[in-house]
Structure formats: C-alpha cells, structure tokens
Amino acid sequence: MVRAKRKLDHIEYALSTGQSRTHGFHDIDFVHQSLPNSSYETITCETKIGELSLSSPIFINAMTGGGGEKTLHINEQLAYVAKHHNLAMAVGSQMAALKDESEAASYKIIRKVNPNGIFFANLGSEATVEQAELAVDMIEANALQIHLNVIQELTMPEGDRDFTGVLQRIEKIVLNSKVPVIVKEVGFGMSKETMQQLASVGVTAIDIGGQGGTNFAAVENERRQRMLSYFNNWGIQTATSIIEATSTNNNLSFIASGGIQTALDVAKAIALGANTTAFAGYFLRILMEDGIEKLVDEIDLLHTDLKFIMTALGAKTIEELQSVPLVVKGETYHWLTQRGIDTTHYSRR
C-alpha cells in the first residue's frame, strides 16, 4: 500500500513541479545550410538502439505502474498512443508488481493493447537476476531498463541509503539477460566516468536521463517534512551529458532524455550523438490535462517538425543528422572545457 501510494504521489508532484527546461540545448546552435540538397518527402526517421530497430527517434519513456487502477489507465492510454504511432515504450519500475502480484495488471495492460509493440521493462539497480527475468517476462519485454536514482532515493523519505555493489549487480543482469539491458538515469545526468564503468561490465545502451525535465529531487522534497533543497539543482544537464557520453569512445548506443519537448530538442540531441530520444513528463502532462487525442496530435507534429528541421540541415536520415555541424557555446561549453572535452569537432565536420 505504501509503494502504491508513492506511485500516485509521483504522478501528482511530477505534474505540479513541472519541467525545469534547464537542459542546455539553448547552448547548441546548428550551422545553417543554404544549399541543403534535400527533400522533405525523402526524409526517413528510422534509428537503432544497439541491435533494436525503431521506426522513430522518439519513444515514450518510463512513467508509472504499480499504483492501482489509475496507473493501469495511464499505461493503457500510453500503450494506445505507442501503437498508433508505432513508438517504443517503457513502463515505470515493476518492483511494485514483484512485491505485490495484484499490481502486475497495471503493467501487463500494455501488451494487451499493443501485442506487437516494442516495450522496455524497468527495475531499479537493487534488482536481482531473478527479478530482472520476472520483469521482462511480465510484459514480454524487448529490452530491460535498469534505473540509477541515487539522488531520488536519498531525498525520498523511505528511500534507500546504501548504494554499494550496484555495478556488480548490473554486470550480473547483463550477463544473464535474454534481452538488451539499458541503464538509465532519472533526471540527474551521467558523467563520462559513469558510462565508462557501465561499458566495462558489458552495458551497450545508456539513457543519460539529464537534468532539465521532471526533477525527482523536487518531487520527493514535496513528500518530506524537512526538505533537502540542496538536491533540487543537482545534476548534469541533458546536452552536457550527451556530449560527455560521446566523448567516451565506447561502442555504446545513447538515448537522450531530460526535458526534451520539441522537435528542435530532438534534432539537437541526435546531432550531439544520441541515437534516439525519450519523452516522459511532457507527454504525461498532455495526456492528463488535454487527453489522449491531443497527445496523438502532438506526436504527429513532432515528427513533422523534425522532418522540416532535417530538411533544412540536409540530413536525409538520422545517421546523417548525427553528422551535421553545430556550435557549442555558453555554460555548456565552459563545463565541457573544464572537463577536458573538446567540442570543436562538432563545428568543423
């Protein structure tokens, strides 16, 4: 019951605290192309995360589940939207259903709505190999997300306080998983060092989950009597984290998430090196406040606008979009300079 109540609290406070939009994409400028030699009608948006092929560089990221009828209904609607647009979709942490079997329906509903969809299971880094297998089987998942949420847990009144052995548990899951494993942050970004550690234990896909979207420190602080306000601005911005990711030179696929709301955000994230992008809080707000048809329409517009931007840049495919010239400036540039990461290759390609 406590876990289910927390799931509902997260939805309420995620909506009320909103998205900070401090993602850093304002520091990224495309170099205009007056002769793009492209046609809107020939633009294609297919992409891949590792060996997993996706029809769009936009997918519905982990939001909820395990909170009774309300979360079941949300996942049901999101699965419908995913089916309509042929998008991949992740569910929220399934630990609730592993602890209480009655909550499994709030996750299984997605497969009923969209039998042939691409779905990602989701568990925290405390999960065992056996729990990971159960989560994947529960929704017949195509991949498994393992989320890292140290700051959220520390801010959460009833959260974890011990984070030893996480990398070793992830390694065991990677070695034993029958589906690809994606390790993700939840809005605090990832450093290049973290990603190098993950790559060293066999992780091949990372969702950088940067600062700039739903702020789970702020969400958990709403649930506390004494706020840990020093965590409210903690983290690495999304744009910065993507560049840190690409600087590792590992054979990794990257998902960009964290405050992404527009087609321009998507285009910039991919041009910086992401393979795909993920939306959560922005889609949830539209669904809850404006309804499912409005969300369907918004995703249509995102795809249209992304193709307009790609046409302007002369990028006919997502792979070509990853090679267009851009300039990194402002606070993002200064951060990366201090971190010893050269950004001039973006502007000179």
UniProtKB/Swiss-Prot annotation:
What the entry lists under SUPFAM superfamilies is as follows:
FMN-linked oxidoreductases
- Which keywords, in A-to-Z order, does the entry hold? Cytoplasm, Flavoprotein, FMN, Isomerase, Isoprene biosynthesis, Magnesium, Metal-binding, NADP
Q: Does the keyword Magnesium apply?
A: yes
InterPro entries (alphabetical): Aldolase_TIM, FMN-dep_DH, IPdP_isomerase
Q: List the disulfide bonds.
A: none
- Tell me which residues bind Mg(2+): E153
A Pfam family name for this chain?
FMN_dh
Question: Which coenzymes or cofactors are required?
Answer: FMN; NADPH; Mg(2+)
What would be one Gene Ontology cellular-component term for the protein?
Answer: cytoplasm
Which GO annotations describe the biological process of this protein? isoprenoid biosynthetic process
Reaction(s) the record says it catalyses:
isopentenyl diphosphate = dimethylallyl diphosphate
Enzyme Commission number, as recorded: 5.3.3.2
Q: What does this protein do?
A: Involved in the biosynthesis of isoprenoids. Catalyzes the 1,3-allylic rearrangement of the homoallylic substrate isopentenyl (IPP) to its allylic isomer, dimethylallyl diphosphate (DMAPP).
Assembly: Homooctamer. Dimer of tetramers.
Q: What is the protein's given name? A: Isopentenyl-diphosphate delta-isomerase
**Species of origin:** Bacillus thuringiensis (strain Al Hakam)
